[in-house]
Structure formats: structure tokens, C-alpha cells
Curated annotation (Swiss-Prot):
Source species: Salmonella paratyphi C (strain RKS4594)
GO biological process: D-amino acid metabolic process
Stated family: Belongs to the ACC deaminase/D-cysteine desulfhydrase family.
Subunit-structure text: Homodimer.
The protein, known as: D-cysteine desulfhydrase
Amino acid sequence: MPLHHLTRFPRLELIGAPTPLEYLPRLSDYLGREIYIKRDDVTPIAMGGNKLRKLEFLVADALREGADTLITAGAIQSNHVRQTVAVAAKLGLHCVALLENPIGTTAENYLTNGNRLLLDLFNTQIEMCDALTDPDAQLQTLATRIEAQGFRPYVIPVGGSSALGAMGYVESALEIAQQCAEVVGLSSVVVASGSAGTHAGLAVGLEHLMPDVELIGVTVSRSVAEQKPRVISLQQAIAGQLALTATADIHLWDDYFAPGYGVPNDAGMEAVKLLASLEGVLLDPVYTGKAMAGLIDGISQKRFNDDGPILFIHTGGAPALFAYHPHV
């Protein structure tokens, strides 16, 4: 794989070292399958998470452009927004977050606790909207207004999921391949598929580094018909920028996100409790709980290609547990 193309893109060091790839012995015994976990939940800024990989590239680009303000958008309990504003605070940048309440709740914990509490600690300028119906356009409108106030804004898309941001997960695929080399013969990788950048970056990287490994994206907000074009679009954009081909099919399971984005379900919450009780690992109700529910059910229903070892990508999100009490 011509990884030298990745060096064409400026990158700000935020993570510092490969995140752990660990065997989960008690969960493996429980499920009757070797299960490993990639601990992107323990990245070092603001309670961790996968978005830091994307922000290494996006914020480097913002600094290159001379920006003094980061603008992004997401749900009130967005992990992406939390990590973006924390990086802004670390770098002395202003940060504006455009937030929506996607589940229409008036529950105090959701509106004030978890990730939302942390946004205040990071001194974020909060802008509320009724809904992020066209987030790219809404972010550009906000950026125009902020620029008129004398700031130099840089827009970071929802989830950090642009081709540039997703380079962080092409690099993650390299990290996984190096950690598994001559140690673990992975059969499958499972990841939550939301804004699609993490999924698409892994798809490009794994196709070239571990072509026999099956990559499954468990959707957290959309049907396969809605999500697949988003992942493919990013997959092709990433490959184009790296002068690579990307022909691997995109595999998605959409059986585990109902009743909708940001709304806990029983299978997801059972997965959260299972990982906590067996391994001391904290998942979340929005992304990783539902993705783990897919992994567990996929084993039960024999949905994977074979019976080999499975790697679960832990993208973070534990701060949201506090926002979803008493569901937890």
C-alpha cells in the first residue's frame, strides 16, 4: 500500500501512540468466539474517542489556513463535538457548536449532563437549531456569520467525516495490521457506521492491508439503502486522494439501530451492561452499544463469513452514559 501518499496531508499529533488492541477473554468465553477490541475510547483528550484520529488531519488543515475558530455540528450529546471543542481549547482556538436535539426529549440529564456538560467546561459557544436538516449548508451559513464578527472560521463537518478526516482511519487500519501481524489472524472487524468516515477509512485501509478480513458496519441511524451510498462516496473520495483503487464491497447491518438515532434500545443496553460486567469496558447507548449488539447477534445468527477471531472497534462515547440515565 503506498502509504507515502498519507504524508502529503498535514497532521497534528494528538494521540501520540497506537491505541491498545486487547483480547477480551471473558466475553470470548461467553460468546464462544475469540473477540478482540481496538481501544480508540482511550485516546488522550477529553475522555477519548475515535474523532481525534480525524481531527489530527482536519485541525492541521485549519491551522495551515490560519483559522482561529473551529465550527462544527451535531446532537446535544455528540461525541464528535466534545472532542472537537476540547482540541480547540487545547490549542487556544475559539469553537462554535451548532447543536440539535434529535430525540426531542426534555429530560434534564440529556439536555445538561454527559457530553453537553463538558461543552460548557471547554468554554464552547453554543448555537441551537431545530434540526440539522442540511448540516453542510447550515454550517456554512454559521461560518459566514462568525466571519462577519471578525473571526477566521474553519468548518469541520458532522462527525469529522470528510475524505480528509477519514485519513485518520486509513492510518488506523495500518495500526491494526501492524498490531495483528503474526499474532492474530483476524476474520472480521465490526464498527459502528454513522457519519461514515470511520467506516470508509477502514474500508480503504483494510482492503489494501488485510484484504481477506471482512469489515461489517453496524448502522446507528440509517437503513442500508440510505447508509451504503454515503460510505461508498467517502470510500471513493479517500481512495482518489491516495491514488488507490477501492473495489471492496461495503457490508452493512441495519437491524440494530431502531427505534432511531440516539434512542437506546434493549439489545444495545444489554450489550453495554454485558461489556461492563464481563470486561470492565464502557460502551455507550448510541453507537458502540448498538454495534456490539450487532456483533453478538451476528455470532448467534451465524452472519459472519466464518468462525474466526473478530475485532470490535471501540469508538468511545462513554460520557453519554450519564446523559441517558435512568435508561442505563
